[in-house]
């Protein structure tokens, strides 16, 4: 069911991205038809160890310092937003793909079916989880759903820091999904298969897309088994063997200006895939009100928050999920 537009709560205009290295926030105005404009932005560095992404351990080890960083961002904004959309690191959640030949008509039945599927390989108790899902690819084998599962208390650590700074997190999403949102907003004609590699100080995430749909996602922490080269190779094999892929139309890399060993990461990806890669450029999706020339590392830091802010501006315009 879709609510009449006048009865809907307006989505947050501000998106904030919390990473192990910084807090970045943007406020976006505009529309898909008229174009999007960043009217405010701010980035506040974080000291090492304040945020440590983890699936099963505390993520925010020094909450007072994270709260202060958020307050500093609002000071640079010139005002404190009451509600924000929040981007958290990929490492705090598990992303799964489930497929059903027949999708239940009732949302409550679909909820239960997805929870039942997750119990088979859940990294923690379902009762302790915060779960969200959205429609993915639809094929002759059925309807696929992209499911995100995280411990409720760990997501709560990020939400609590926002609340303590004076801003309520009205929505929470993962970093790489919103880097992809920025890519799609900058090139809405994307139809073919493309690969996104999101390199961060704490690891890397790879996502295969078919047009706007996520077909594969894998995150590996920097202390996990194997390096980026192995992850790229495994992803390429999955693409060929399981997805029947015939080749990526584009390979895009984000995070390369901020991550340790960024140039090495680019060479690794190009060597493994045998083709050149492109940098994600969120400037294709938005303009900036101050018309300044932004350094690449700043643009890189703002990418995920730009992606989520745009997604919020367009929420509800493409039909219900």
How does the language model describe each region?
Residues 1-321:
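Hydrophobic/aromatic-enriched cytosolic interaction surfaces used to assemble or bind macromolecules
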């Amino acid at each position: 069911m879709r609510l009449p537009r006048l009865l809907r709560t307006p989505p947050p205009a501000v998106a904030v991205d919390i990473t192990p290295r910084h807090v970045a926030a943007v406020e976006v105005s505009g529309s898909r038809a008229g174009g999007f404009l960043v009217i405010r932005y701010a980035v506040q560095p974080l000291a090492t160890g304040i945020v440590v992404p983890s699936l099963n351990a505390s993520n925010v080890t020094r909450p007072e310092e994270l709260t202060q960083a958020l307050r500093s961002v609002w000071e640079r904004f010139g005002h404190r937003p009451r509600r924000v959309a929040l981007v958290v690191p990929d490492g705090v959640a598990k992303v799964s793909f489930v497929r059903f030949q027949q999708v239940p008509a009732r949302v409550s039945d679909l909820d239960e079916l997805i929870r039942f599927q997750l119990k088979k390989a859940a990294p923690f108790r379902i009762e302790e989880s915060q779960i969200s899902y959205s429609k993915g690819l639809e094929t002759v084998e059925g309807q696929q759903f992209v499911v995100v599962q995280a411990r409720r208390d760990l997501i709560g650590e990020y939400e609590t820091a926002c609340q303590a700074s004076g801003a309520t997190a009205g929505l929470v999403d993962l970093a790489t999904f919103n880097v992809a949102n920025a890519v799609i907003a900058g090139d809405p004609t994307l139809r073919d298969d493309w690969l996104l590699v999101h390199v961060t100080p704490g690891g890397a995430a790879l996502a295969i897309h078919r047009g706007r749909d996520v077909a594969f996602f894998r995150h590996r922490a920097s202390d996990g088994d194997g390096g980026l080269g192995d992850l790229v190779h495994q992803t390429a094999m999955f693409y060929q063997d399981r997805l029947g892929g015939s080749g990526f139309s584009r390979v895009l890399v984000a995070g390369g200006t901020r991550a340790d060993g960024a140039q090495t990461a680019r060479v690794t990806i190009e060597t493994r895939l045998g083709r050149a890669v492109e940098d994600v450029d969120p400037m294709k999706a938005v303009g900036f009100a101050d018309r300044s020339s932004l350094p690449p590392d700043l643009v890189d830091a703002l990418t995920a928050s730009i992606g989520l802010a745009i997604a919020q501006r367009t929420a509800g315009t493409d039909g219900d999920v």
